[in-house]
Amino acid sequence: MIRRLFIGIVASLACLTSWAQELELDSIQATDMMVELKELVVKGGLPNTRLKGNAMITRVEGTPLAQSGTLGEMLVKVPGMTGTEDSPEVLGKGAPLIYINGRLLRDDSELKRLRSEDIRDVEVINNPGAQYDATVRAVVRIRTKRQQGEGLSLDLTATTEQDLRYGFNRPSGKLGLNYRTGGVDVFGSVYYFHQDYRQYSWLEETTNTTKLFHQEGPYTMTWKNNLLTYTAGVNWQINDNHSVGVRADLTQFLGGTNMVIFDEDVFENNIRIDHLYSEQTSKETKPLGILTNAYYNGTAGKLGIDFNFDFLSTEINTARENVENSLVNDDFVLSGSGTESRLYATKLVLSYPVWKGMLEAGTEMTFARRHNTYWIDKPTIADTDADIKEDNIATFVEYGTDFGQWGKASVGLRYEHTLFDYKDDMNSDYLHRSMHEFFPTAAYSVRLGNVQTALSYSLKTNRPSFFAMNDAVTYISRYSMQSGNSQLLNERLHDLTLSASWQWLTLTASYGRCKHVITQWSFVSDDDAALIKHINLDRPVNTLGAYIAFTPRVGIWSLNATAGVEKQDLYLDLEDPHVQGGMRRAYFDKPVYTLNAFNTFSLKHDWRFDINFMLRSHGHQLNFYDDYDNMRLNLIVQKTFLKDKALTLRAAVLDALQRNHMNEYGDMGYYKIQQNNRYSTHKFQFTVIYRLNATRSKYKGTGAGKDAQQRMKN
């Protein structure tokens, strides 16, 4: 089925190419120097999007995207992207690495702190080359506006979000200062955020072994915390060939409490045997978190040099109380956990022109240390005191060349040596792995008439997060527990991506084959408790995706829309004692459809209205099925004031239809789970933005050790 679909997509691309070549349209002329590289600039609508190799570059400055709000709100509107403002994704590729002026975005709160007005353009790379970590399936590179001017500038933003259904409020604010003189740029900011988030769910679990065991009932999850983020840095542009800089992000956690409430009935062979009401309260403390980056960027003759050094230090301690009221017996359970993480990373990229192209080579080294502890006052669950050590040393080389009218091509190879040690002093568990892996990449792009096309291939991997490898059993309730798995294998993914762009239309199709897929599975204990832990599937997963983006503009109205489908080919043979032979085959192959439509109406006197609609249909993702069509409708109005447009007022109703839901069903043979989630996203949002003498930071650090940093956060 997937093969026939893929052949059909390729045939459609061929027809599009032929049709476009027959059209007698005037070629698009532009003053941008990049046109000289024979890239296709897509006009006829905003934002302007062009295909460059296997990357889509979207201009933000001077388009309706520039007034989207926060960086996160803008990214979900960029062609080739989807997701939410808190978790943007690249279509068909998942969460990307995000760079801002070459610096890795290491703190997700920057998605809220940075404004879309500051952005010049966004580059979406849907199949990154050998320079990037082998775990990276997509990269988003953001460039801010290059404004001239010196002196002091101020940037003040204040936002309040009022939940329209449950009544709570979530304020945030940022004060940023920038001072520029000559080639020196000094910047700093303070950001405050109050988190108040609710999730309301209905949970059903059925275990069908020698007896039928069933649990059902509502549960509520609440997260509340306050944090301050301090940012400071300096950039020195020595001359046109040399620049250096350093940046530090300090996060002060002001305390937080999470609460999970279960209220469920328990049945055995259709007879109620218990009613459990459980309150789990978690109080978190975190010392000051440190994220730093230092860089040098320059040239020595024809040799380009890009060097980065990163350091990360985080710690979190959690104390939990479980109060359980039951028909069988009441209980009070105490537990606690702690995590300390340290990371040192460095990356060096050298570039040199060779023949008609550019040769890039370099190295990246990451050294990660993590210490996990867990204790509980129940003798049936073991305590944990584990050390995790992971060292990754990589070298890479990539060469790209331009064949003129015959197109551009690049090939690359990345070698990674990974050393992993896991040791638990409480139970003598020890695991040692030493891996040597090669990851090839290749890309080819050519313009066929008025159509720009690109084809790319890469071999990728996905390493489990440090949380997923933690063997400690976390107590949720007497019927539910959770654990990691230090025996997990890395995923191996072959990725083939085809792109085509014509005027304001862009089509992307991709095929992926993944082995050792990591997912969650349930195991049943002798006392009928469910243990959820991570496993590797024993079958590969084939996935096909196709997306089309179109960005027309008519008068005051501009549209940025994306439609697509993603389908996986997966079946599993599941243990089920109630079928003949004790095994049954389950198919997980229902496609997921996506439709995003971002409408902008730009009126006189600096008024602007936005109607943003996002739809994700029901369908399978790995061994889980979402049977709900998720919809989000956001209505936004904003007005700019003062002669220099320094003041902006913005009001929005988020999730106006209250359809941001998810109903997830998991089939694991003898164990089935249905979880229906309702999120607290129906809100009224009001934002005030004031800027004085706006300038932009010239910081050019790219960051290193990106994969390990992300896995520590997960």
Residue ranges and their predicted role:
Residues 22-64, 84-85, 93, 125-126:
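Short, acidic, small-residue-rich periplasmic hinge/interaction motif at the N-terminus
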Residues 28, 39, 71-74, 109, ...:
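N-terminal periplasmic accessory domains that precede
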Residues 49, 72-104:
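Extracytoplasmic beta-strand/coil segments of soluble accessory domains associated
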Residues 77, 103-129:
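Short acidic/polar hinge/loop motifs at secondary-structure boundaries
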Residues 144-160, 200-204, 216, 228-232, ...:
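Surface-exposed extracellular loop regions of Gram-negative outer-membrane beta-barrel proteins
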Residues 229-255, 279-424, 445-447, 452, ...:
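Face-selective signature of the C-terminal outer-membrane beta-barrel domain
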Residues 343-347, 394, 489, 506-596:
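Outer membrane beta-barrel strand-and-loop segments of large Gram-negative receptors
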Residues 388, 430-435, 461-515, 530-545, ...:
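Outer-membrane beta-barrel signature, preferentially recognizing the C-terminal barrel domain
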